[in-house]
């Protein structure tokens, strides 16, 4: 398990307000999933005080680029709030929060909190959601009052084009991943601890049928080609570095490598179809700086905040507010040009533990762990 570390994210940089602005187009996001409706049990956020200052400890599984964008844009609106970041996987962060429950250090979590998590983290998060919850696109408002859903993570293959060509392959589909040439050449993360990996398992279930014999037959055939990495970011970084041919991953992580100049990888949405899970942020129960945390959650979920973030990132992340504007220079493929499959979020949430148990049983006998 990797160590936790604080990220230095250019807090001392002097940036103009234009740094988080930009020319924008129309709003664009994934089609609505089959998701449970908001329970309405959570209270909405109050208007934040005119002046906020002090500290804010953010636990996050997001990429360094995403965190840089958030802190830069957030500090333009709240320059007197000092943000400290602790980075780790969703599993690492929730385990740490549970251990700190009697004396919380963190104020909020961003990333890795998925709509499929249900109430499993009710002991560490406050039942509080953003005042912008009603502005979320259909199907992506809070599932239970614990999480404010701010962005979508879409399933994608990250393909090393040089290695693909050397093997004489043209990887387009899930069926293509079963090629014997890819034995030990597909990198994946552990769905027991990685929300990105669970997102990919969920998409396989959505393509082949949730918990169906066809889905499990496919997974069993795929496993000999898989290598499990210690972090979800390895599923695109190690592909770009030439260690693996394919990574089963999420689009914003992979597209940022392309944006940063990588020329030996491409993003391939499964030809059978892709889907997205909503990820969000959550207020830590009894955290030391709740008002600052609420201000950040509201910023993350507002059209203003999401438009600023999208412009700063050049459209490398899909957001949930129906009113946010996608920049004209967005790197992601427009949703209208992609094949989407429906995802039964309610079923996957209710049966997550059983699905993971079945996965673990198959992996234990796959002979490559």
Task: Provide a role label for each language-model segment.
Residues 15-19:
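C-terminal motif of bacterial Sec signal peptides marking the signal peptidase cleavage site
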Residues 21-24:
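Bacterial signal peptide processing site
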Residues 47-52, 57-82, 119, 157, ...:
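Short, polar/charged alpha-helical segment
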Residues 57-68, 90-91, 105-243:
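Extracytoplasmic ligand-binding site segments that recognize negatively charged/polar headgroups
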Residues 115-120, 245-264:
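A ligand-binding cleft/hinge motif common to bilobed small-molecule-binding domains
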Residues 153, 181-192, 217-222, 228, 261-285, 299-323:
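Periplasmic-binding protein-like
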Residues 158-163, 205, 277-289, 299-300, ...:
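A bilobed periplasmic-binding-protein/Venus flytrap-type ligand-binding module shared by bacterial periplasmic
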């Amino acid at each position: 398990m990797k160590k936790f570390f604080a990220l230095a994210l250019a807090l001392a940089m002097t940036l103009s307000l234009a740094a988080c602005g930009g020319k924008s187009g129309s709003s664009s996001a994934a089609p609505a999933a089959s998701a449970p409706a908001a329970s309405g049990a959570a209270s909405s956020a109050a208007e934040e005080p005119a002046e906020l200052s002090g500290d804010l400890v953010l636990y996050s599984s997001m990429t360094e680029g995403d965190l840089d964008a958030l802190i830069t844009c957030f500090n333009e609106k709240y320059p007197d709030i000092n943000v400290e970041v602790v980075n780790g996987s969703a599993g690492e962060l929730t385990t740490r929060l549970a251990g700190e429950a009697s004396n919380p250090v963190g104020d909020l979590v961003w990333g890795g909190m998925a709509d499929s998590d249900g109430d499993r983290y009710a002991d560490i998060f406050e039942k509080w959601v953003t005042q912008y919850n009603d502005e979320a696109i259909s199907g992506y408002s809070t599932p239970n009052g614990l999480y404010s859903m701010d962005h979508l993570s879409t399933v994608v293959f990250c393909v090393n084009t040089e290695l693909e060509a050397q093997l004489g392959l043209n990887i387009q589909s899930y069926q293509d991943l079963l090629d014997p040439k890819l034995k030990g050449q597909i990198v994946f993360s552990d769905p027991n601890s990685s929300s990105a990996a669970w997102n990919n398992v969920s998409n396989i279930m959505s393509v082949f049928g949730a918990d169906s014999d066809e889905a499990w037959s496919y997974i069993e055939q795929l496993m000999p080609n898989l290598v499990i990495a210690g972090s979800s970011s390895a599923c695109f970084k190690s592909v770009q570095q030439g260690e693996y041919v394919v990574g089963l991953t999420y689009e914003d992580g992979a597209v940022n490598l392309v944006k940063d100049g990588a020329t030996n990888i491409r993003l391939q949405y499964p030809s059978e179809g892709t889907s997205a899970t909503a990820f969000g942020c959550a207020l830590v129960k009894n955290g030391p700086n709740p008002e600052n945390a609420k201000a950040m959650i509201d910023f993350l979920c507002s059209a203003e905040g999401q438009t600023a973030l999208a412009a700063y990132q050049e459209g490398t992340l899909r957001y949930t507010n129906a009113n946010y504007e996608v920049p004209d220079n967005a790197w992601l493929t427009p949703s209208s040009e992609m094949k989407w499959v429906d995802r039964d979020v309610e079923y996957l949430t209710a049966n997550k533990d059983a699905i993971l148990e079945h996965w673990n049983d198959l992996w234990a006998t796959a002979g490559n762990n």
